[in-house]
């Protein structure tokens, strides 16, 4: 969605931008999963977009696959371990009754079409009526999609989900006139409307977000033509998605036990994590040999998407596709440049980490396929769900009593759907709507990763709780630029708590490695993605064809730069660009690195300053989209227009690397 059309969705459409907040955790962990998609947001708001894409991600492990048929039916799961969706609608009958009531309201959504410029009253009434309908529609959809996700084999709830989605489409169509018509009103007249009708001040920031796009809005006929062409212009991305997810198949290789096993998108990561190096290498070679057979097609689809991005930017009178993409959240381009420049400056830290990996794994040389096998085993760290709740409450205690009370409310009032059952969707997410509790989907396993996942998702949920409680409906959402800050701050606080309180040194090593890998995947890797993305958009804008050879060489050279001379950069990795769905969502991934860095800065302030930093942070959680993301973060204590947060995050990585090296030496000598 671009330009005017995008603003309809981002500013006013609750369904995408702020009614539903879903963040699939597996997609936010630095894309270390082979199906790394993000995702990720709003235009592509972090919520709904992540959820849709996550339907394709995160396979189950080989052991889990064997157990899949032993999972209980949904009806056999204890009620106390499920989310209490009855708090949204007490019954399916109540949902259907509300559905019919909202359906009858849809035709009136367009009753003010052609009348917004007539008076302040008409403008206000159109906006408030739209909000009331979309708020109710958001609750309908949230209930339906979560009922569907708890058992994807339940055709009744799949039907509810489809009905809610179709109703939303009707509502979106009926309100599509709003933004173009607001833009047709002269600025002086809009300001006069706001002055003469006090209630319109509620929408002043939202209207400002729309009107700042005036220089980039075309004539009505031109905008209509672009809208008509959007499906055609998006065909490259659709072709990639079908090819990558439906048509490409990988060969079989022998697993650790000598059994033939076919590689899939879902289990590729399990092969790469294998302790058997031959298994890792064979999986790596097989996957990239397969992608090599499709490199010409993949180059065509990626080139088509980049051309589309550059085309939209050009006709909308932006200097570049990057400026166009970042303008959606009013992010200065210097934020992007600061990230790339600062991370490049600190690449020796990544080189040092690779050297440590080589030493610990006792390898003569480190290859790309050696990056994923665990550096440190879990040291027997089995964590039950009950233990995880205790860890979470203690680890997040620095955020204060009010924050703790919200966590307890969520745990006690069944915000979390805890365990696996047959048909339940994979992964984890936080969801909800304005006027409902936040909800969390988990598929609990007794390990540290699930502990961090739970804390991560509660970060999103408490963020949503504060935002919806303290902001009116038009601002009861938040952009992806700040979304991952809240979840990652929680992870950082938990990590520090565990490091300070675990007595077993091997367990502390495991936590340190978890934190270092998180940084490598979320900051170093995503910044490399961001650098690649900008390079190919720039080359295409300058008229250079994006051939498979060019794409492969650019990507290979970036890997050489990022990983350094201490690592063998296998030629196959040059083809990784061909399987990354990120690159079809222009200028999106940099936000993972900036969000992670902001979270590290905020968590450090919270632990060092105490209450003043906590108060700023809670105000940040309450702000929603009432201000621009950059401004919200500045008030919290982090200025992302400067390199300082990235510098501070790199300093944290260095300190954790020091600590791990020292602890490894100590454990080895004991």
UniProtKB/Swiss-Prot annotation:
- Signal peptide (residue range): none
Which Pfam family, any one, appears in the UniProt record? Peptidase_M3_N
Q: Phenotype upon knockout?
A: Inactivation of the gene does not cause any detectable phenotype in sporulation growth conditions. Deletion does not affect cell growth in rich or minimal medium.
Offer a single GO CC term for the protein.
Answer: cytoplasm
Residues noted as binding Zn(2+) in the record, renumbered to the chain? 456, 460, 463
Question: Which keywords has UniProt assigned to this entry?
Answer: Cytoplasm, Hydrolase, Metal-binding, Metalloprotease, Protease, Zinc
Q: Which InterPro entries match?
A: OligopepF_N_dom, OligoPept_F_C, Pept_M3A_M3B, Pept_M3A_M3B_dom, Peptidase_M3B
What does the cofactor section's free text say about binding?
Answer: Binds 1 zinc ion.
Q: What EC number is given for this enzyme?
A: 3.4.24.-
Where in or outside the cell is it found? Cytoplasm
Kindly give the CDD domains that the UniProt entry links to this protein: M3B_PepF (cd09608)
Give the active-site positions: 457
Q: Which GO terms describe its molecular function?
A: metal ion binding; metalloendopeptidase activity
Instruction: Answer whether the UniProt record assigns the keyword NAD to this protein.
Output: no
One GO BP on record is: proteolysis
State if Cytoplasm is listed as a keyword: yes
Q: What induces it?
A: Expressed at a low level during exponential phase and induced twofold immediately after the transition to stationary phase. This induction is dependent on the sporulation transcription factor Spo0A through an indirect mechanism.
Q: Its family?
A: Belongs to the peptidase M3B family.
Known function: Overexpression results in inhibition of sporulation initiation. This sporulation deficiency could be the result of hydrolysis by PepF of the PhrA peptide, a phosphatase regulator. Thus, overexpression of PepF appears to act at the level of the phosphorelay, most likely through modulation of the negative role played by phosphatases. Overexpression of PepF also affects the activity of the competence and sporulation stimulating factor PhrC.
State what protein this is by name: Oligopeptidase PepF
Q: Which organism is it from?
A: Bacillus subtilis (strain 168)
Q: What is the lineage of its organism?
A: Bacteria, Bacillati, Bacillota, Bacilli, Bacillales
Tell me what gene encodes this.
pepF
């Amino acid at each position: 969605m671009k330009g005017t059309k995008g603003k309809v969705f981002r500013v006013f459409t609750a369904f995408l931008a702020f009614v539903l907040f879903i963040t699939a955790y597996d997609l936010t962990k630095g894309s270390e999963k082979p199906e790394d998609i993000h995702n990720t947001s709003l235009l592509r708001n972090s919520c709904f977009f992540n959820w849709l894409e996550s339907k394709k991600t995160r396979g189950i492990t080989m052991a889990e696959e064997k157990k899949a048929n032993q999972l209980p039916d949904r009806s056999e799961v204890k009620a106390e371990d499920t989310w209490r969706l009855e708090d949204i609608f007490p019954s399916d009958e109540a949902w259907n009754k509300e559905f019919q009531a909202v359906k009858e309201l849809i035709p009136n959504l367009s009753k003010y079409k052609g009348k917004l410029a007539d008076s302040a009253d008409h403008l206000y009434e159109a906006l408030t009526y739209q909000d009331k309908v979309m708020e109710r529609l958001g609750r309908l959809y949230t209930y339906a999609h979560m009922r569907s996700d708890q058992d994807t084999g339940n055709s009744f709830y799949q039907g509810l989900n489809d009905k809610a989605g179709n109703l939303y489409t009707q509502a979106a169509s009926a309100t599509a006139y709003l933004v173009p018509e607001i833009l047709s009103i002269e600025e002086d007249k809009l300001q006069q409307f706001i002055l003469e009708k006090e209630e319109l001040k509620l929408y002043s920031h939202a209207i400002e977000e729309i009107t700042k796009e005036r220089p980039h809005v075309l004539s009505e006929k031109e905008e209509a033509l672009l809208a008509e062409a959007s499906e055609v212009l998006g065909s490259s991305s659709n072709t990639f998605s079908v090819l990558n997810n439906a048509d490409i198949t990988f060969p079989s290789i022998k697993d650790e036990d000598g059994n033939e096993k076919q590689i899939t998108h879902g289990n590729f990561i399990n092969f790469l994590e294998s302790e058997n190096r031959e298994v890792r290498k064979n999986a790596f070679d097989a996957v990239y040999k397969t992608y090599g057979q499709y490199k010409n097609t993949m180059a065509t689809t990626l080139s088509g998407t980049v051309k589309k991005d550059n085309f939209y930017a050009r006709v909308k009178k932006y200097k570049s596709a990057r400026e166009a993409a970042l303008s959606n959240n009013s992010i200065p381009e210097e934020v992007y440049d600061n990230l790339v420049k600062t991370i490049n400056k600190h690449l020796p830290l990544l080189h040092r980490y690779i050297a440590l990996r080589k030493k610990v794994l006792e390898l003569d040389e480190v290859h790309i396929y050696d990056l994923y096998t665990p550096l440190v085993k879990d040291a027997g760290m089995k964590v039950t769900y009950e233990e995880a709740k205790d860890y979470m409450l203690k680890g997040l205690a620095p955020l204060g009593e009010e924050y703790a009370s919200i966590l307890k409310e969520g745990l006690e009032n069944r915000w979390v759907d805890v365990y696996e059952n047959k048909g339940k969707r994979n992964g984890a997410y936080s969801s909800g709507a304005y006027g409902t509790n936040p909800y969390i989907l988990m598929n609990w396993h007794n390990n540290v990763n699930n502990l961090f996942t739970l804390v991560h998702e509660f970060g999103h949920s408490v963020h949503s709780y504060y935002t919806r409680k303290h902001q009116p409906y038009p601002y009861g959402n938040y952009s992806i630029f700040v979304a991952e800050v809240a979840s990652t701050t929680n992870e950082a606080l938990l990590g520090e708590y565990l490091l300070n309180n675990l007595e077993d040194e091997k367990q502390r090593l495991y936590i340190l490695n978890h934190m270092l890998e998180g940084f490598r995947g979320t900051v170093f890797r995503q910044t490399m993605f961001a650098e690649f993305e900008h390079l190919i958009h720039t080359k295409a804008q300058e008229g250079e064809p994006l051939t498979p050879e060019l794409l492969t060489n650019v990507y290979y050279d970036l890997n050489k730069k990022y990983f350094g001379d201490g690592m063998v950069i296998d030629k196959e990795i040059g083809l990784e660009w061909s399987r990354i769905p990120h690159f079809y969502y222009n200028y999106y991934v940099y936000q993972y690195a900036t969000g992670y860095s902001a979270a590290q800065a905020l968590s450090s302030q919270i632990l060092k300053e105490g209450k003043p930093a906590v108060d700023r942070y809670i105000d940040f959680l309450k702000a929603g989209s009432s201000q621009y993301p950059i401004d919200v973060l500045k008030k919290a204590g982090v200025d992302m227009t400067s390199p300082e947060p990235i510098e501070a995050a790199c300093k944290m990585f260095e300190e954790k690397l020091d600590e791990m090296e020292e602890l490894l030496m100590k454990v080895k000598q004991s």
